[in-house]
Curated annotation (Swiss-Prot):
Superkingdom: Eukaryota
Cofactors: Mg(2+)
HAMAP family in UniProt: Enolase
Gene this chain is encoded by: ENO
Transmembrane helix among keywords: no
Keywords: Cytoplasm, Glycolysis, Lyase, Magnesium, Metal-binding
InterPro entries: Enolase (IPR000941), Enolase-like_C_sf (IPR036849), Enolase-like_N (IPR029017), Enolase_C (IPR020810), Enolase_CS (IPR020809), Enolase_N (IPR020811)
UniProt-recorded name of the protein: Enolase
Alphabetical GO biological process terms: glycolytic process
Cofactor binding comment, as recorded: Mg(2+) is required for catalysis and for stabilizing the dimer.
Binding-site residues, Mg(2+): 245, 294, 319
Principal EC category: lyase
Pathway the protein contributes to: Carbohydrate degradation; glycolysis; pyruvate from D-glyceraldehyde 3-phosphate: step 4/5
Organism: Schistosoma japonicum
EC number: 4.2.1.11
Length: 434
């Protein structure tokens, strides 16, 4: 049960930037975890420690975080001898060792790497599949397969096109299983490529950070129109619905929203007030089968969020607003800012805190969507996490790029392992029937 050794190293994420990988050894074997990284990061996220004083890797190295694992966290944990099955005790020990609320001393990327590896080791110690172990940690007796939200058109900070809104997603809510959902997602994705190629040419089929296409369009409505057409051609109208991640903090300027923010000469007269921006979203919801909108407003535009949430029945997801942080989530619940939490383990920096954030949101009647980051690795931990936490929904990119498929393929394996007992969230993705 005891940890024998911990070793961290610097590896690379899917954008070619350095990130932290941790190896943890017990008598059961070696357990490896890699930490993801975001592009559009909320200002309230736990601190991802980068080597800003070094010119190497454009000041994005993580050797300081690696050193903190190898020279501070590892010796302290080895001395403490906490069993790997005591996840909360291990995480709390590292949080106290850091001493800062945002994990700014050791780095959230250092602490999370160890936390992930400990979780994998704990599952092995109890001879449980990782998803079953996570369910045990969260107090769930059963598990559920999630609806995948495939990000098939990329804009915002994830792509070099003119689109302001960051992600246009498809959700196969009408599938009968996760396996069928993958088929639907793949077929819509390839039909979308054909639609984009026909209308904009082959170079418009370049993909963004998360595997989605990045056609050089500026009209966000056009992105939705392309999705609707691809869904229709694939034969899944009514079975595949649409989601969006607006990442509106990226185009928030001087209290207004600039949908031409990538243009240095953007005309201020065209910027939209929060109410005008809300009307754009309402028009989209009316015209297209949208079931989920993430980050429709700036992370601190607290007045705008509750108005939109109260005016629509769809899922309004807080990401930059809540950053998987219990204090931010508590405030959002109090003012009824949104009705769904986007759960990113690296925003808060430990498994225990991620589970606590999830349970807090679910207790308030919110949905929870587990998420990857745009800078990913081949680590597929979040696939087991979403099944174990029973959230019913996951977004981890398009059905393209191996670091994205690593998660989807693991979910296929889990569904196969569950066999006839596997349950797919489907139309109940916001509140899965466990």
């Amino acid at each position: 049960m005891a940890i024998i050794a911990i070793h961290a190293r610097q590896i690379f994420d899917s954008r070619g930037n350095p990130t932290v990988e941790v190896d943890l050894k017990t008598a059961k074997g070696l357990f490896r975890a890699a930490v993801p990284s975001g592009a559009s990061t909320g200002v309230h996220e736990a601190l991802e420690l980068r080597d800003t004083n070094s010119k190497a890797y454009m000041c994005k190295g993580v050797l300081t975080a690696v050193s903190n694992v190898n020279n501070i966290i590892a010796p302290a944990l080895l001395k403490k001898q906490i069993p790997v099955t005591n996840q909360s005790e291990v995480d709390q020990f590292m949080i106290e060792l850091d001493g800062k609320e945002n994990k700014g001393n050791l780095g959230a990327n250092a602490i999370l790497g160890v936390s992930l590896a400990v979780c994998k080791a704990g599952a092995a110690e109890l001879n449980l599949p990782l998803y079953r172990y996570i369910a045990k940690l969260a107090g769930h007796k059963d598990v559920i397969m999630p609806v995948p939200a495939f990000n098939v058109i990329n804009g915002g900070s994830h792509a070099g096109n003119k689109l302001a809104m960051q992600e246009f997603m498809i959700l196969p809510t009408g599938a009968s299983s996760f396996t069928e959902a993958m088929q639907m997602g793949s077929e819509v994705y390839h039909n979308l490529k054909a639609v984009i190629k026909r209308e904009f040419g082959l170079d418009a089929c370049n993909v963004g950070d998360e595997g989605g296409f990045a056609p050089n369009i500026q009209d966000n409505m056009k992105g939705l129109q392309l999705l609707e057409e691809a869904i229709k051609i694939a034969g899944y109208t009514g079975k595949v619905e649409i989601g969006m991640d607006c990442a509106a903090s990226e185009y928030y300027k001087k209290g207004k929203y600039d949908l031409d923010f990538k243009n240095p000469q953007s005309a201020e007269s065209h910027w939209l007030s929060p109410d005008e921006m809300a009307n754009v979203y309402k028009e989209m919801i009316q015209k297209y089968p949208i079931v989920s909108i993430e980050d429709p407003f700036d992370q601190d535009d607290w007045d705008a969020w509750p108005k939109l949430t109260a005016s629509t029945n769809i899922q309004i997801v807080g990401d930059d607003l809540t950053v998987t942080n219990p204090k931010r989530i508590e405030k959002a619940i109090k003012v009824k800012a949104c009705n769904c939490l986007l759960l990113k383990v690296n925003q808060i920096g430990s498994i225990t805190e991620s589970i606590e954030a999830c349970k807090m949101a679910q207790k308030a009647g919110w949905g929870v969507m587990v998420s990857h980051r745009s800078g990913e690795t081949e680590d597929n931990f979040i696939a087991d996490l979403v099944v174990g936490l029973c959230t019913g929904q996951i977004k981890t990119g398009a059905p393209c790029r191996s670091e994205r498929l690593a998660k989807y393929n693991q979910l296929l394996r889990i569904e196969e392992e569950l066999g006839s007992t596997a349950k797919y969230a489907g139309k109940h993705f916001r509140h899965p029937q466990i």
